[in-house]
């Protein structure tokens, strides 16, 4: 199952948290879910070059808090905050006038973010860079930045071949079955003249130890 299930979904509630954090009754659930989808799609389309990895959404009554994780906060914020203000007004229009608050968080090491790595490989494939070169360079950067393991996979008409195929490379460890293993996963698509090429990335950053156990050990040391 470790090869089939989404690495983040497999770890939700254990070491990973939900990207949408709110509760709704049966009547409102569908509406809120569609709103979340529209918010994420609009932000990704408008700020595709800003290196946005994750968009978290929290709700309270008529207020929505949107947390944007980006490698280039300057592009999102804009000059004197004009970019954030324009984005906030657009999102309020999408959600039917609900109060939107935006929180921009910088990704300190984009080389260790699986989504950004996948998007970077996809962007290079669109520029006709060799898929092997793009994958190996991305893996080398991740390992230099402190990753304990990385796996990249591309699927499609690689190099313009008549028959689609899948190729992958792996360096280090990727313990998919270990729930405490902090594995980041990303997916992107490259739109080439030959069709779409799917890019998947797994990055292993180390184990996340439970906080309760750590607290108990400290108490025992005293």
From Swiss-Prot:
It comes from the Bacteria. One of its GO terms (biological process) is translation. Disulfide bonds: none annotated. InterPro entries: KH_dom, KH_dom-like_a/b, KH_dom_type_2, KH_sf_prok-type, Ribosomal_S3_C_sf, Ribosomal_uS3_bac-typ, Ribosomal_uS3_C, Ribosomal_uS3_CS. Residues 39-108 form the KH type-2 domain. One of its GO terms (cellular component) is cytosolic small ribosomal subunit. Keywords: Ribonucleoprotein, Ribosomal protein, RNA-binding, rRNA-binding. It holds the Pfam family KH_2. GO terms for molecular function: mRNA binding; rRNA binding; structural constituent of ribosome. PROSITE patterns: KH_TYPE_2 (PS50823), RIBOSOMAL_S3 (PS00548). Part of the 30S ribosomal subunit. Forms a tight complex with proteins S10 and S14. Belongs to the universal ribosomal protein uS3 family. Binds the lower part of the 30S subunit head. Binds mRNA in the 70S ribosome, positioning it for translation. This is Small ribosomal subunit protein uS3. The gene is rpsC.
